[in-house]
Amino acid sequence: MQGSVTEFLRPRLVGIETVSPRRAKVTLEPLERGFGHTLGNALRRILLSSMPGCAVTEVEIDGVLHEYSSKEGVQEDIIEILLNLKGLAVILEGKNEAVLTVTKSGEGPVTAADIQHDGDVTIANPDHVICTLTGEGSISMRIKVEMGRGYVPASARRDAEEEDRAIGRLLVDASFSPVVRIAYDVDSARVEQRTDLDKLVLDMETNGTLDPEEAIRRASTILAEQLDAFVELRDIKEVEQVEEKPLFDPILLRPVDDLELTVRSANCLKAEAIQYIGDLVQRAEVELLKTPNLGKKSLTEIKDVLASRGLSLGMRLENWPPESIVDND
């Protein structure tokens, strides 16, 4: 039975099948109908294009001036050697680039295991063949490895470095992603009576520098962080200029003379230092009757005048008197 139309099923990680040290299958279910392709395609694109990794970016080979040449005593031509170097799986720890060296002579293959490097560099595929020496052949090369993301063709860097690039520095197309292959499949899933749900199976292979499960976790984190901007999206409202409301009704700040009381009543209030209407309304009837020469007739007059202005005796005014009155006094 389907729940509320505003509620969506939350998938769970069903299992991780390790096919090999570099390949794994990750299964997620149940997903709402159509979400299998939505999430599968998004994760696939991120895994292929947005995962950081290391790649060979430059190579210098002794005796070689450009890539369209060959080297005596080496079976492969220079272009083939560069293609083989692109297959190196390197891990850099604590730095963004490193220069590796290879020096070897004598007949036989030159592999990644022959590379000399620092302790903060790891070669994940030491059996990878770089080239093959024949007879008395020898080779010496310097390999620059950098950290990056996505795919950066050599032509993009060649234009920027043309003036500074030394002769013999061979630029290499760099594919930084540690993910070699990623595919996904969407199967049917069932929860209770619902049979229209999706099951997402991600089949991924890396170059050995990153665990497949960790790659999925990183890709999911990247996707979630990018979507956060939409989750926090709010309508942009114009800031309204709110007029500051006065602390007291303006009538309370006016002098008692504005009440136009009789001379007798006005003089009695002045004798008691009641200067403002705000002072007057805080007085109680009993208190005013104690004022010399102010009788019940004057009290009735004061009450009637205040009532006509929506005021009365015995009111409580917090923070009275205001600073403006104190300053004027």
UniProtKB/Swiss-Prot annotation:
It catalyses: RNA(n) + a ribonucleoside 5'-triphosphate = RNA(n+1) + diphosphate. Transmembrane segments: none annotated. GO terms for cellular component: cytoplasm; DNA-directed RNA polymerase complex. Its EC number is 2.7.7.6. One of its GO terms (biological process) is DNA-templated transcription. Keywords: DNA-directed RNA polymerase, Nucleotidyltransferase, Transcription, Transferase. It is an enzyme of class 2 (transferase). It comes from the Bacteria. Residues 1-234 are annotated as: Alpha N-terminal domain (alpha-NTD). GO terms for molecular function: DNA binding; DNA-directed RNA polymerase activity; protein dimerization activity. Residues 248-329 are annotated as: Alpha C-terminal domain (alpha-CTD). Signal peptide: none annotated. DNA-dependent RNA polymerase catalyzes the transcription of DNA into RNA using the four ribonucleoside triphosphates as substrates. Homodimer. The RNAP catalytic core consists of 2 alpha, 1 beta, 1 beta' and 1 omega subunit. When a sigma factor is associated with the core the holoenzyme is formed, which can initiate transcription. HAMAP family: RNApol_bact_RpoA (MF_00059). The N-terminal domain is essential for RNAP assembly and basal transcription, whereas the C-terminal domain is involved in interaction with transcriptional regulators and with upstream promoter elements. Belongs to the RNA polymerase alpha chain family. This is DNA-directed RNA polymerase subunit alpha. The lineage of its organism: Bacteria, Pseudomonadati, Pseudomonadota, Gammaproteobacteria, Alteromonadales.
